[in-house]
């Protein structure tokens, strides 16, 4: 079509049935019409080649099959003979035939796995496979329950073999393999043998049985804790498999879980999808697949009728298609690969690695003091024997005494080595991951929990994250006439525009779309597609509610799907009357710039002059300033001789109209942004929308401030490194951005400004930025599978407020582990000092091996359980983030550790030296009573220090404690077992029952640690080492 320069050239109307027609021509050769003919490529050649064309070849093939005549009249017959011999070699198993199918699972899987074209030909190409699977390429499988069960029994389920669940006893055995516990076990056995030999049963067995019982208690608690964590992580792994896939079943398009896919399903794939099973290409356009995860080849592969093989686990980089599933689960190449890979769930997080270094250092210090303690304790008896000349004469009592000293030394190592550090990290991460799942965040990488707590910048998408992603067209400018959509005063909107413009607009919307209008089981229209496509299709139905009329006619022959680089989608239609028409839609400025004509208010095609162009740009700006997303729709009549092999033109279009789409800001986003700001986290908005829309939304969200800068991607890309260095600290909005712009910004923030960056992404092209960021956050609803695979955390509800919740939980994990480390180091220091100084000055250790093992369990397992599972509070988001270079053990922690250790050691030393006088203890029984009081006081010091450790800076440590059932349970359990240990298990724990007064004084000394801790917190220290002064807003 050509428009006149002067006057009105009327727009050619499309055929009535051509508006919505989306009939795609067959992309594979038709099946042979002659009985027994196989649709091999060789049978569809033009007449004159190979001795008489396809029909004669089919006839010869048929006669050959019936009469077994060994004649070779053509190449086609040769190929056919080979095919018949292959087919005759395949025998359908009886159980498969009985279930109503004509091909077994292994034969079917081998076709795609080996890309066996000959075998595919033998089975009748795509249509033959579909027939043998009892499915329809158009309508998919029938979902009758019995039929689905039969199909599942024959072909299997789409699940991979899971690693065998480790039993509880395996975790117990793993805990028993600890070197220090093995040494203690040997000591216990030796103690039992010597004790029973010298003192008889049961008196001689008390020490040994006590140590064994303590070891078993420690091992069982540790094993139970680790077993529970493994179950939690397995549940989280199952959540990762909850992927919805679009299929056609019973002729209806619907979503099913990836695990429910079966061979015979017709699956719809689009850009960013991960291929959910092995299968064959049915139809589609421009399908480009990344097979590197399977083949290692970095070059993407085109999938079409000539190369119809789609492999599970590969990713769709471009285009869209429909696929016939042929193999699922462990019969796919991906499933077989998964079977030979080891479970990677045991990788340590960065914080665990750092803490292992701390644990090793403390362990070496503990070993040094343990050796010294053993030497000091043993030198008395050994020295005396040397003086008496009895070095070679040892009684059972002498051996037991040395053994006791050795057990104390080994137990000091057990106490000193903080095995609880990695346990605390794992516990805290497991607890946080489970709670975050309830808060709509799926953690894919454990390290993300820690890192998110240090985040200083969040780079967020707009659509669906800051906004609701529930889009509707609220304004439209067609033929220069702007209307309010859904206005009660204009019920028949199409009457506002020329008929020819409405028909062209409908043709554009219904054909140039990745969405689809289908009829659901209730007979009502249902729209499937992205929120943008849904909004446009709803608008089209409002203009002309009868979609059925527009289902036939034009054929889609070429599609260029939308991507964030081109910011447009284009389609070529083959018209019923001949010729081709291109339709294009996308970012308003970009598509309008590609137009040189437009449809005026009379329905005429007129040149797009500067005045009209300026007017349309003003409309775009007006829509955008109202926070509306704008799309421009245009078309172009293709010249005679156009070939579908050519590229879709980028210029020469006729503007049909502009629509304004409302995507409301999510409730609570403004408050969440304010929370981030108070927490020292700056929020940047990165969007593909134009700058006016972006600024309006950013102001509404509270992201764009008076001093902030909003900039477009094109301008951002032109900046030099020096200019970016000055710009980025003030930049709060990046509009019309490409994925490369996002990647560049994230890289600069991390390297030049040393920020810890969290970035959101939903598209395939966002994968580089998600990997570049410290924390990649993918959208669970709008996000593609490629984006989710590249992310550390999946935001299941696509809500910005959930991102803030993840940041809060990340800080909680980090702070909880700091609390535990502070608590544990205090116990370590005091236990070492008490036993070492007592050994040096009195020749005895007041804390025995059994007692130290009990303290170790309080400190390691129970302490980790209590402090590492503290839920986050709002105060966490009122402090500055730790950042990339923040110290883990801060000055605040050292202040608390030193202050509390000095108090506890002073109490222990006072009781050691003045305890007998204080309690009036005399006689042979005085030592064991005093040692029991020291042990009891020491334990209660840890109980109350555990409460004080709930807050490292705040004095009010009781806030929220009543609501923390785990913490209260640990405290109650510790006190209960301490009472049992002291009052009733004295023979095993080297204790004796205490009086009420002695209990009260022990508890009082422990309680006094709380006001002492509060007073220590009043001592001002620098909370963190000074961070970078060059912070972004």
Curated annotation (Swiss-Prot):
<feature type="transmembrane region" description="Helical">
    <location>
        <begin position="269"/>
        <end position="289"/>
    </location>
</feature>
<keyword id="KW-0479">Metal-binding</keyword>
<dbReference type="InterPro" id="IPR023214">
    <property type="entry name" value="HAD_sf"/>
</dbReference>
<keyword id="KW-0460">Magnesium</keyword>
<feature type="transmembrane region" description="Helical">
    <location>
        <begin position="847"/>
        <end position="867"/>
    </location>
</feature>
<feature type="topological domain" description="Cytoplasmic">
    <location>
        <begin position="383"/>
        <end position="405"/>
    </location>
</feature>
<feature type="topological domain" description="Cytoplasmic">
    <location>
        <begin position="949"/>
        <end position="965"/>
    </location>
</feature>
<keyword id="KW-1133">Transmembrane helix</keyword>
<feature type="topological domain" description="Cytoplasmic">
    <location>
        <begin position="1020"/>
        <end position="1033"/>
    </location>
</feature>
<dbReference type="InterPro" id="IPR006068">
    <property type="entry name" value="ATPase_P-typ_cation-transptr_C"/>
</dbReference>
<feature type="transmembrane region" description="Helical">
    <location>
        <begin position="181"/>
        <end position="201"/>
    </location>
</feature>
<dbReference type="InterPro" id="IPR018303">
    <property type="entry name" value="ATPase_P-typ_P_site"/>
</dbReference>
<dbReference type="Pfam" id="PF00122">
    <property type="entry name" value="E1-E2_ATPase"/>
</dbReference>
<dbReference type="InterPro" id="IPR004014">
    <property type="entry name" value="ATPase_P-typ_cation-transptr_N"/>
</dbReference>
<feature type="topological domain" description="Cytoplasmic">
    <location>
        <begin position="1"/>
        <end position="180"/>
    </location>
</feature>
<keyword id="KW-0813">Transport</keyword>
<dbReference type="Pfam" id="PF00689">
    <property type="entry name" value="Cation_ATPase_C"/>
</dbReference>
<keyword id="KW-0109">Calcium transport</keyword>
<feature type="active site" description="4-aspartylphosphate intermediate">
    <location>
        <position position="461"/>
    </location>
</feature>
<dbReference type="InterPro" id="IPR044492">
    <property type="entry name" value="P_typ_ATPase_HD_dom"/>
</dbReference>
<feature type="transmembrane region" description="Helical">
    <location>
        <begin position="966"/>
        <end position="986"/>
    </location>
</feature>
<dbReference type="InterPro" id="IPR023298">
    <property type="entry name" value="ATPase_P-typ_TM_dom_sf"/>
</dbReference>
<dbReference type="Pfam" id="PF00690">
    <property type="entry name" value="Cation_ATPase_N"/>
</dbReference>
<dbReference type="InterPro" id="IPR008250">
    <property type="entry name" value="ATPase_P-typ_transduc_dom_A_sf"/>
</dbReference>
<feature type="transmembrane region" description="Helical">
    <location>
        <begin position="406"/>
        <end position="426"/>
    </location>
</feature>
<feature type="topological domain" description="Cytoplasmic">
    <location>
        <begin position="225"/>
        <end position="268"/>
    </location>
</feature>
<feature type="transmembrane region" description="Helical">
    <location>
        <begin position="204"/>
        <end position="224"/>
    </location>
</feature>
<feature type="binding site">
    <location>
        <position position="766"/>
    </location>
    <ligand>
        <name>Mg(2+)</name>
    </ligand>
</feature>
<feature type="transmembrane region" description="Helical">
    <location>
        <begin position="823"/>
        <end position="843"/>
    </location>
</feature>
<dbReference type="InterPro" id="IPR001757">
    <property type="entry name" value="P_typ_ATPase"/>
</dbReference>
<dbReference type="GO" id="GO:0046872">
    <property type="term" value="F:metal ion binding"/>
</dbReference>
<comment type="function">
    <text>This magnesium-dependent enzyme catalyzes the hydrolysis of ATP coupled with the translocation of calcium from the cytosol out of the cell, into the endoplasmic reticulum, or into organelles.</text>
</comment>
<protein>
    <recommendedName>
        <fullName>Calcium-transporting ATPase 3, plasma membrane-type</fullName>
        <ecNumber>7.2.2.10</ecNumber>
    </recommendedName>
</protein>
<feature type="binding site">
    <location>
        <position position="762"/>
    </location>
    <ligand>
        <name>Mg(2+)</name>
    </ligand>
</feature>
<keyword id="KW-1278">Translocase</keyword>
<dbReference type="GO" id="GO:0005886">
    <property type="term" value="C:plasma membrane"/>
</dbReference>
<keyword id="KW-0406">Ion transport</keyword>
<dbReference type="GO" id="GO:0005524">
    <property type="term" value="F:ATP binding"/>
</dbReference>
<comment type="similarity">
    <text>Belongs to the cation transport ATPase (P-type) (TC 3.A.3) family. Type IIB subfamily.</text>
</comment>
<feature type="topological domain" description="Cytoplasmic">
    <location>
        <begin position="844"/>
        <end position="846"/>
    </location>
</feature>
<keyword id="KW-0106">Calcium</keyword>
<dbReference type="GO" id="GO:0043231">
    <property type="term" value="C:intracellular membrane-bounded organelle"/>
</dbReference>
